Amino acid sequence: MTLDKLDFQTDYLSLDSEFYDMTEPTPLDDAYLISFNPHAAKLIDLESSSGDDPRFVDLLNGTFRPEGVRPFSMCYAGHQFGHYAPRLGDGRAINLGSINGWHLQTKGGGETLYARMSDGRAAIPSSIREYLMSEAMHHLGIPTTRALGVIGSQTKILRNDIEKAAIVMRMSPSWVRFGTFEYFYYTKQHDKLEALTDYAIVESYPHLKDDEDRYFKFFSEVVERTAKLIAQWQSIGFCHGVMNTDNMSIAGLTIDYGPFSMLDDFDFGFVCNKTDKAGRYSYGEQPNISYWNLTMFSKALSPLIDQNRMQKKLDDYGSFLYPNAYIDVMRKKLGLEMKLDEDAELITELVGALQDAYVDYTNFFRTLSRYDGERMPLYDIAMNPVAIHNWL
């Protein structure tokens, strides 16, 4: 369909007004198209030629509103670096509504009521990074938000230097976060907490909506999806950088691409966020932080679900859900055709060898994929080839 035929739904606005605030975007000056994503456009039945339509830039810039668009920003709280922040929300994200189950949201469209002294803008480099990385993650088979397009402008913003502002259009099956539940738990609005849970089930786990035990099963599936997601992150060397509970998706998606990075030399202690001085969100800590975040999520759900039942599910995360998910994806990465009891030991020894070898993570697997018995190509890419030799 063409841009003028888009018809947005805003089911989230059926919730109480404390869940959101209506927001008016602030258009950029002299906005222009940087990139349009025809692959993401197919998800909402938008014609691939829409990137050539000037109204696409206007859509992202907030000056063109198709049928049903009602801009709003979502309210949530969250634990940031382990400390509870009682009111966060979409500081620079503006939701337009949903099409075909995909919620469209602009990032960088101006100040919202949650901006917290920021300008509500996004710089061109960081916007392009998110646009490219979210699409790369999708094509690597990792659950993620998508990006429909990105625009630049002549609007100047102050970061470390003066930069030009951009807006990226993000798409997600859900923008509900762990921190959304925390907000209503800590403000003791348990009726709204229940309404949010019902909404999240219909949105992301519709097969549970008529189940008598739907709240516990909802929590269980969030734990399972999160375990699989983090295992996939670890398998490709993805480091998120800001794993606060407000950046954790209840749908098991990679969301909020900020100071993310990919591993170069394999290093469990790698930290991609310069503000993370203690290494809380280092590459090697991501599985543990996910468990901690799920524990905070379980606390937020405790008015609805027995805490002991949730704790047993959390114990499963550490004992077999995450370890098994990680072994499964690494088994595929190594091209192992059969599941053997020895696989876990083989993979554990491999990552230990990579840590000791000072070797580029991605390059190691590219080289290993061409392994024909000749070891020198693998030795040549390691600063400490003895570690690779001992594993082989």
For every predicted segment, state its role:
Residues 1-75, 272, 277-392:
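Regulatory N- and C-terminal appendages and interdomain linkers associated
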Residues 2-3, 9-10, 16-19, 79-82, ...:
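Short secondary-structure boundary micro-motifs
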Residues 10-16, 102-113, 197, 201, ...:
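Active-site-adjacent bridging/hinge elements
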Residues 24-26, 119-121, 216-217:
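Short, contiguous strand/loop micro-motifs
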Residues 30-33, 38-51, 56, 61-210, ...:
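Conserved ATP-binding subdomain of kinase catalytic cores across diverse folds
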Residues 127, 156-240, 250-340:
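ATP-dependent phospho-/nucleotidyl transfer catalytic cores
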Residues 246:
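Conserved protein-kinase catalytic-loop position immediately C-terminal to the HRD catalytic Asp
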